Amino acid sequence: MSDPVVRLRELRRSFSQGGVTIDVLRGVNLEIRPGEIVALLGPSGSGKSTMLQAIGLLEGGFSGLIEIAGTDASKLSGDDRTALRRDHLGFVYQFHHLLPDFNAIENVVLPQLVAGTDRAVAEARAAELLSALGLAKRLDHRPSQLSGGEQQRVAVARALANRPEMVLADEPTGNLDEATADRVLEEFLKLVRGEGSAALIATHNERLALRMDRVVRLHEGVLE
């Protein structure tokens, strides 16, 4: 069996609010194998976003093991953590966070240029991903010229642009109507599977969660 692309051991995170300590994550253990798509199910406020931020190495304050592609992130410097995130992880958020002054293809090209990819190669990769998501005729449109579903498709393409081993998605369809959400999720899952990436998709929607390979539930700071 292949080694996990993500391994968590006794992951903990607490916050202080008004002199009270709130334990958000209370010893989370999880392994995700290459190519596996896992739903992280839980209600709003259950700590799903906090857990994704931990795996994504987006903030500190966590205790326990966070291992990405066999590397213990706690032993890395800030620059090395950034490189680990860039080289192995992709991100999709509920709100797309696209650059408003760049068109669709440039939003997908940019992270590849940051990673050192040749522009011609990056443009071909971006066009390939956007076309696979049904946006072949919208490549030169800015985010303001795209529908909500189209914007989120661009965000999906951007997340996969650098061929990450793991995609982290935080309520990726939560800002869309049900019909659009279903279509975007179907296209997202198809593309992730085609790329061979693993994914952890946070959602409060059990109906959508059941379309993943596996469902884990975050309840009172631990996984069930």
From Swiss-Prot:
Its EC number is 7.6.2.-. ATP binds at G42, P43, S44, G45, S46, G47, K48, S49. It is found in: Cell inner membrane. Disulfide bonds: none annotated. Residues 6-224 form the ABC transporter domain. It is an enzyme of class 7 (translocase). One of its GO terms (cellular component) is plasma membrane. It comes from the Bacteria. Keywords: ATP-binding, Cell inner membrane, Cell membrane, Membrane, Nucleotide-binding, Translocase, Transport. It is a peripheral membrane protein. SUPFAM superfamilies: P-loop containing nucleoside triphosphate hydrolases. Transmembrane segments: none annotated. PROSITE patterns: ABC_TRANSPORTER_1 (PS00211), ABC_TRANSPORTER_2 (PS50893), LOLD (PS51244). Belongs to the ABC transporter superfamily. Lipoprotein translocase (TC 3.A.1.125) family. The complex is composed of two ATP-binding proteins (LolD) and two transmembrane proteins (LolC and LolE). Part of the ABC transporter complex LolCDE involved in the translocation of mature outer membrane-directed lipoproteins, from the inner membrane to the periplasmic chaperone, LolA. Responsible for the formation of the LolA-lipoprotein complex in an ATP-dependent manner. This is Lipoprotein-releasing system ATP-binding protein LolD.
